[in-house]
């Protein structure tokens, strides 16, 4: 299963609980995004990163800058 390549967050198990208190198994999956990241060596790499790491600034996201011809 998929994991965040920065913090290691992965899916965990839990229970769905209905109104009658009947329990069934379920998975809680992390919100992973495949983003281009600038590594410590300055290389651009695609990684699976959870949104918690993105919003906390634990990775530096690569943004391409295209120059338009006028």
UniProtKB/Swiss-Prot annotation:
GO terms for biological process: translation. Keywords: Ribonucleoprotein, Ribosomal protein. Belongs to the bacterial ribosomal protein bL28 family. This is Large ribosomal subunit protein bL28. It comes from the Bacteria. The keyword Ribosomal protein applies. It comes from Thermosipho melanesiensis (strain DSM 12029 / CIP 104789 / BI429). The keyword Ribosomal protein applies. GO terms for molecular function: structural constituent of ribosome. GO terms for cellular component: ribonucleoprotein complex; ribosome. It holds the Pfam family Ribosomal_L28.
């Amino acid at each position: 299963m998929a994991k965040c390549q920065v913090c290691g967050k992965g899916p965990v198990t839990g229970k769905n609980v209905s109104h009658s208190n009947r329990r069934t198994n379920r998975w809680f999956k992390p919100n992973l995004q495949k983003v281009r990241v600038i590594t410590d060596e300055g290389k651009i790499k695609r990684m699976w990163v959870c949104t918690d790491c993105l919003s906390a600034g634990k990775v530096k996201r690569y943004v391409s800058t295209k120059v338009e011809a006028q």
